[in-house]
Amino acid sequence: MHLLIEALLDGDQARSIAEAKRLGAAGAAVEQIVVDGIGKAVEQLDGKCTIEQFNLLEIMLVGRAVMGVVKELFPQGEPGVIIRGTVIVCSLEGDVHDLGKSILKMVLTAKGYRVIDCGRDCPLDKLLETAGQQQADAVCISGLITTVIPQVKRVRELAQERGLEHIKILAGGAALKQATAENLKVDFVADTAFDGARYLESALS
């Protein structure tokens, strides 16, 4: 498994996929590859993401390698095992940035969550309709521009109107992490994707 972890942390997608295939052919279960391979690699990346060591390019390359392996393991596009919970991710209407959302999707997928991506520029109705249809446990909203803040503040109210009071609401991104959870009317404001993943691990356990 250490060879897969090494390939992932090197950001080498082709080598990562080849190693995942080799492990599968040798009898490793998909769950083991995700938990002991992808999961451990993401944990190590998390540990490096201090202010001094933060490297956005490295995260993007690792993310690309991780998602390549995930697609190899789940060719139908959705994990059939080790689902720890269903999470909806999006950038709200008016925000066309999706880097932060993509990193969060990578981290959560690596940790065994079923992640539904509503994309960028996503209307609130689409977000909550998807959350209801997919029986989501949480929604994660990424915001890079301040104009989405009024929309974020409405998510809780609209979720309650749809009978989705149980859903955890997370916010993150440059425009949102300056605010408090109370101000945004959400459960948690994440400084980083890893921070958000740690909160979900605790909240949904």
Annotate the PLM regions.
Residues 199-205:
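A charged, well-structured terminal subsegment
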